């Protein structure tokens, strides 16, 4: 038989006998590599090592260091989970069990209601299956045969999945010991490869995500190649749980979500203090970058949303109402309102660039199951801005937006990486304009010396964009900021300006948001700082702790002076021991605690403690007062 040739990532070509599998090929390359390889990327597709080589294909072998390798190992872990459940509860019916980001899950239909204690039993059975090191084999069968096969096993969900496939489909299954599952793969060679795993939680999940269908039991888990990696990940999760903004939001009195308004957060006084500081900072930065602030209405007519395209493409996410027998909608986005502000007057080329910024409250109908603290809500404030400009101003304006983003993220010690998302298949607009817009984004980010990666085809249909992914103190990334060149709304709304030639032209429009959502950003910062906010942001900046009742008057006089200069201060005048008061203030994560007793009253001093336990000792009150005012003003 003729040889087949494959191309490796370094560009080199390797030839093998026809019929050679990917798994056999990697052994020829390196035995040590073969022990680590879990799957392969063939012409951009994640592929099972059991598959035969295809002549001329580009092949990259994947280990656990690669996303495809992680996906494959965790997919196999989900099958081991399913096999363990079937051993323990043979009557259980299996639905789906994919790998997901950071782990895997399996949806199961069974009479027994799973408990956290059951997870331990399942893990023990999974460990037995791993120890058995069962070879994993792939088989295929015609569609009708597969339907009959799974019907005989009473696996109704598998039958439904197969019935949705075309009649000529070839159905693939994977087996390990006496367990077989419908699956497209890929999977690792044997169950023994999955050495480090942990089942994490149980949740409810509707079959196929449809609340009209039966509620199944979903078991979540994760898997790693090495136990040390699993332990490190679980430690990270423990730390993240301590920092959960929902938990800290309640403990610190920042916000609450009531059953009367699911997805609609209430900001409490301390939460508003924090929020106001963020908004003040936002306004200062935008003032420095020559933005003008606007505010647009929350409710606007159906006609506007038809023009913008939201009525046809986003209506299911919008809240609507009737006013004077006409349909209106609560805005899900600020952009159309910003366009109306632009259209309030005819503009000349001399007016550009125009920079309009808005902290605009928007509402979107999210499914109740998707709601999550401040991270996923139904009402939130977007820090949107729309920059209207001439074509030759595009790169300069983009660079200014990039500078603005850097200034804001740097204030919070947030590292970030940037992705340039390019033209998708369903793009609207002229190819030349797309190329010019993409090139302008690329040139701007390169001119600022900021590393970025290309995210091909992931731009919006109306324009390319820069997506900012910020990294918090635990190393987790969050997609926040977006800089978008919008070629859709200017066209839909027919916005114009009078050019130097006296003719009407269409301006270029940048749509950008840095925080993304004020609520979500507050949630991220709460977890980033573990609730111990910098002094300028802290809801309570100073807590004065009188040792006894006779020191309360002095404490209140100090608080009065600080309050007059807008320092957020509280006095703990309860009849409690000073050690208890200090612990309570530490738990409230107040940046500064001032202990006052006889000595302090007599000398006009305060004994200063910082959150975290540092004792700064006794200092004159005026000295402390001046230093904290500078710290707050300079946002150190």
PLM regions: where:
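NTP/phosphate- and nucleic-acid-binding module
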Residues: 1-75, 80-95, 100-636
């Amino acid at each position: 038989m003729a040889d087949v040739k494959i191309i490796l990532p370094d560009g080199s070509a390797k030839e093998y006998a026809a019929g050679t599998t990917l798994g056999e090929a990697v052994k020829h390359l390196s035995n040590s590599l073969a022990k680590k390889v879990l799957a392969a990327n063939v012409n951009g597709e994640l592929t099972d090592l059991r598959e035969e080589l295809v002549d001329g294909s580009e092949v990259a072998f994947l280990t656990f260091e690669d996303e495809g390798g992680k996906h494959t190992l965790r997919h196999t872990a989900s099958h081991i989970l399913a096999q363990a459940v079937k051993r323990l509860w043979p009557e259980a019916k299996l639905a789906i069990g994919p790998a997901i980001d950071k782990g895997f899950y399996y949806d199961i239909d069974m009479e027994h209601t799973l408990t956290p204690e059951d997870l331990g039993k399942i893990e023990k059975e999974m460990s037995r299956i791993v120890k058995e090191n069962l070879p994993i084999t792939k088989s295929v069968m015609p569609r009708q045969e597969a339907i009959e096969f799974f019907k005989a096993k009473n696996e109704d969900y598998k039958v439904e999945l197969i019935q949705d496939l075309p009649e000529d489909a070839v159905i693939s299954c994977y087996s390990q010991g006496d367990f077989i599952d419908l699956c497209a793969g890929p999977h690792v060679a044997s169950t023994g490869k999955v050495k480090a795993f942990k089942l994490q939680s149980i949740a409810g999940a509707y079959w196929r995500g449809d609340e009209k269908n039966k509620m199944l039991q979903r078991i979540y888990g994760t898997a790693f190649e090495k136990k040390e990696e699993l332990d490190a990940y679980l430690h990270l999760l423990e730390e993240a749980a301590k920092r959960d903004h929902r938990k800290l939001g309640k403990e610190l009195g920042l916000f609450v979500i009531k059953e009367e308004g699911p997805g609609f957060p209430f900001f409490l006084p301390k939460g508003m203090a924090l929020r106001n500081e963020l908004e003040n900072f936002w306004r200062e930065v935008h003032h420095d970058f020559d933005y003008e602030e606007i505010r647009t209405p929350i409710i606007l007519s159906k006609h506007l949303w038809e023009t913008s395209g939201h009525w046809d493409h986003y209506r299911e996410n919008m809240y609507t109402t009737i006013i004077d027998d006409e349909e209106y909608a609560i805005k899900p986005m600020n952009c159309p309102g910003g366009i109306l502000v632009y259209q309030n007057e005819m503009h000349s080329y001399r007016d550009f660039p125009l920079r309009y910024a808005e902290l605009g409250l928007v509402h979107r109908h999210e499914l109740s199951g998707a709601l999550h603290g401040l991270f996923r809500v139904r009402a939130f404030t977007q820090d949107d801005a729309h920059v209207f400009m001439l074509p030759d101003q595009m790169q300069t304006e983009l660079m200014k937006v990039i500078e603005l983003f850097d200034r804001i993220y740097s204030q919070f010690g947030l590292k970030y990486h940037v992705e340039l998302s390019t033209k998708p298949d369903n793009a609207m607009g002229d190819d030349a304009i797309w190329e010019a817009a993409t090139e302008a984004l690329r040139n701007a980010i390169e001119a600022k010396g900021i590393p970025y990666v290309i995210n091909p085809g992931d731009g919006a249909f109306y324009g390319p964009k820069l997506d900012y992914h910020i990294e918090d103190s635990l190393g987790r990334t969050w997609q926040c900021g977006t800089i978008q060149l919008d070629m859709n709304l200017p066209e839909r709304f027919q916005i114009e300006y009078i050019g130097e030639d006296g003719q009407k032209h269409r301006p270029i429009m940048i749509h950008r948001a840095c925080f993304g959502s004020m609520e979500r950003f507050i949630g991220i910062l709460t977890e980033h700082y573990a609730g111990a906010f910098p002094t300028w942001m802290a809801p309570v900046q100073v807590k004065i702790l009188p040792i006894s009742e006779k020191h309360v008057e002095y404490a209140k006089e100090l608080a009065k002076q600080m309050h007059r200069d807008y320092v957020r201060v509280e006095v703990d005048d309860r009849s409690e021991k000073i050690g208890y008061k200090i612990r309570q203030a530490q738990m409230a994560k107040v940046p500064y605690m001032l202990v006052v007793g006889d000595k302090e009253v007599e000398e006009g001093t305060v004994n200063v403690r910082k959150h975290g336990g540092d004792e700064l000792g006794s200092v004159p009150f005026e000295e402390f007062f001046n230093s904290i005012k500078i710290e707050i003003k300079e946002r150190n």
